[in-house]
Amino acid sequence: MTRCDDSPSASQISITHVTQGSCVASSSPNEVYATILGSCICTCMCDPVAGVGGMNHFLLPSADVEDAQHLRYGSHAMELLINALLKLGAARQRIEAKIFGGAMMTPQLGAIGQANAAFARRYLKDEGIRCTAHSLGGNRARRIRFWPKTGRVQQMFLGSEDVVPNEQPQFRLQGGAGDVTFFDRHNNAEMPDPIKEPR
C-alpha cells in the first residue's frame, strides 16, 4: 500500500516521557511528548510557523505565590523551554502556550496545585506569551500527549485506580497551534472540549 500523505506511521513515532523537572523541545514530526500530571504543571509551547515545540514539567516548592525565591523554580522551567525553542528557530512573538495540571491530589501538598496554575498563567501574561488553551485544577490526574511539530495536544483524565508519579516539591534548579483532544479513560470517548480561553 502506498501512503498518500506525509504523516508518520505508528512505527516511526518516538514517544519521550517528560518527568518532573524536565524540559524538551523538537521540530521532528515523529516526536511525541508524554507526561502524567497531578499537582504539577506542564507547559506546551509551539511556534506554528517554524514548526517547533516543547514541553516542561515542574512543581513549585510551596503554595506561596508571593515567595520570589520559590517562584524562581517555575521561572527557570519556563525560561529553559523558551530558550530551547529559540535555538530551534522559533520567534518569541509567535510562541503560543497551552498549560495543564495543577490538581489538588493530596492534603499533604495543600494548595500547591492551585499555586502552580496561578504562577503559570501569570508568567505567560507577564511575558506576553499567548495562552491559547488551558485545563487546570480539579482533583484528577491528567495524562498529556503533545506533538511539538504541530502544537496538537491530547489530554486524558485518569481514574483513582491509575498510578500517578509521586510528586515532590524540588529545591534545586534543573537544567500553539493545533487542536486539543480530550478523552475520558472510563468510556474512551472523546469529550466535549472543556478547555477555557484565558481572560
From Swiss-Prot:
InterPro entries from the xrefs? CheD-like_sf, Chemorcpt_Glu_NH3ase_CheD, Cytotoxic_necrot_fac-like_cat
Hydrolase recorded as keyword = yes
**What biological process terms from GO does the record include?**
chemotaxis
Which Pfam families does the record cross-reference, listed alphabetically?
CheD (PF03975)
Enzyme Commission (EC) number: 3.5.1.44
Q: What class of enzyme is it?
A: hydrolase
Q: Which UniProt keywords apply?
A: Chemotaxis, Hydrolase
Catalytic activity from the UniProt record:
L-glutaminyl-[protein] + H2O = L-glutamyl-[protein] + NH4(+)
Q: Does the keyword Hydrolase apply?
A: yes
Q: Which GO terms describe its molecular function?
A: protein-glutamine glutaminase activity
SUPFAM superfamilies, alphabetized: CNF1/YfiH-like putative cysteine hydrolases
The record describes the protein's role as:
Probably deamidates glutamine residues to glutamate on methyl-accepting chemotaxis receptors (MCPs), playing an important role in chemotaxis.
Task: Name the family.
Answer: Belongs to the CheD family.
What is the protein named? Probable chemoreceptor glutamine deamidase CheD
Gene designation: cheD
